[in-house]
Amino acid sequence: MPTTTRETYHHGDLRSALLRAAMAMLEAGEPFSLRAVARRAEVSQTAPYRHFADREALESALAVQGFRDLRLRLSLDGSPAASEDELVEFAVAYVLFALEHPALFTLMFGRECDDGNDERVLAAAELRELLAGSLRGLFPDADHDALATALWSVTHGLAFLHLDGKLPSGSTREVAERVRDSIAALRTAFSTPATASSTDGAAARTPTRVPEESSA
């Protein structure tokens, strides 16, 4: 089989080939540099520098691909969730994506974002807007920023708890049900009035303010 060289790539194909090689190395847990990726893609050692200034630029390009793939996983046509149940399925898809692509997910969220990479910033913003748009449509009177932070924190936390082995991964179905059950439990708890004993206990734990002494 003939060796692939940089001369065989058409315009735009070299970048795609480098990203495929880098993604394969990332998911396999192989440390990579631009030179290592070039060897994996079977191109010249200097070829990657045509598209990526350094390893950080290559990592940002992988993160961009990850954000876009995750957004498609949540909504193929980019439409916001049309119901609360669909919003919950967004959370399920988010966690399952993390388990299917652990190294990529960690690269996307577990490392400091390169704020100087406009494409990466935009891709992350588009993912956030999918959630924000869903919340605006479903809960028009809510504090959307606070609600988005809460929902993302729960979902993101579940993703990393599974990745870190703090929660058993099990089958896809088991993980999906755990995500659904967790969100359902929170919805139920916050929609149910606190019992008298709970409120009494909270009051008992509230420290009594001591009046300030008069200076007279």
Where are these regions (language model features)?
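N-terminal intrinsically disordered/low-complexity leader segments
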Residues: 1-13, 194-216
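Basic, helix-initiating cap at the start of DNA-binding domains
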Residues: 1-27, 31, 56-60
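Generic hydrophobic, amphipathic alpha-helix propensity
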Residues: 13-22, 37, 62-66, 70, ...
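Append "Primarily bacterial transcriptional regulators
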Residues: 36-40, 48
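Hydrophobic alpha-helical connector segments
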Residues: 75-104, 125-128, 151
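Amphipathic alpha-helical segments used for helix-helix packing
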Residues: 99-115, 160-168
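Amphipathic alpha-helical packing segments from all-alpha helical-bundle domains
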Residues: 115-141, 145-150, 173-185
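Amphipathic C-terminal alpha-helical segment
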Residues: 153-170, 185-194
